[in-house]
Amino acid sequence: IIYPGTLWCGHGNVSSSPDELGRFKHTDSCCRSHDMCPDVMSAGESKHGLTNTASHTRLSCDCDDKFYDCLKNSSDTISSYFVGEMYFNILDTKCYKLEHPVTGCGKRTEGRCLNYTVDKSKPKVYQWFDLRKY
């Protein structure tokens, strides 16, 4: 399913070339960049010492953070809002990054950790992290 007015926002894309964008160009550009993230983990794949047990692809936190910021700064406010809601709030996925071992959660809202506490005395390892709510 691709969000109406876009070619890149949804499962896969329906563009005829990497340069083609839909009617909502700003939103679609955010989705295209997100789709081209160089660090992804497909469903069932293991990488960086982690295994993606979700039924969908998960991305590095760097790519998801850039996607979030891109959508928030898009001039296509309505389409960006709906795409952000779907990805960050409804899909309720996680991202991964290299960070000192998590020891707890300093602040939690709606079942998601917003502020992790880490043990800086130990070396960084790849771990799963909750995404921000949109």
Swiss-Prot record:
Disulfide partners: 9-31, 30-70, 37-63, 61-95, 105-113
One Pfam family of this chain: Phospholip_A2_2
Source organism phylogeny: Eukaryota, Metazoa, Ecdysozoa, Arthropoda, Hexapoda
Gene3D superfamilies referenced in this protein's UniProt entry, alphabetically: Phospholipase A2 domain (1.20.90.10)
Taxonomic superkingdom: Eukaryota
Cofactor(s) required for function per UniProt: Ca(2+)
Keywords in alphabetical order: Allergen, Calcium, Disulfide bond, Glycoprotein, Hydrolase, Lipid degradation, Lipid metabolism, Metal-binding, Secreted
EC number: 3.1.1.4
Name under which the protein is recorded: Phospholipase A2
GO BP terms in the entry: arachidonate secretion; lipid catabolic process; phospholipid metabolic process
Residues at the catalytic site: 34, 64
Tissue-specific expression: Expressed by the venom gland.
Known role: PLA2 catalyzes the calcium-dependent hydrolysis of the 2-acyl groups in 3-sn-phosphoglycerides.
Positions contributing to Ca(2+) binding: 8, 10, 12, 35
Glycosylation sites: 13
Alphabetical list of InterPro entries matching this protein: PLipase_A2_dom, PLipase_A2_dom_sf, PLipase_A2_His_AS
Catalytic activity entry: a 1,2-diacyl-sn-glycero-3-phosphocholine + H2O = a 1-acyl-sn-glycero-3-phosphocholine + a fatty acid + H(+)
Family: Belongs to the phospholipase A2 family. Group III subfamily.
Localization of this protein: Secreted
PROSITE patterns assigned: PA2_HIS
GO MF term list: metal ion binding; phospholipase A2 activity
Predominant place of localization: secreted
Cofactor remark: Binds 1 Ca(2+) ion.
Class of the enzyme per the UniProt entry, highest EC level: hydrolase
Gene Ontology cellular-component annotations: extracellular region
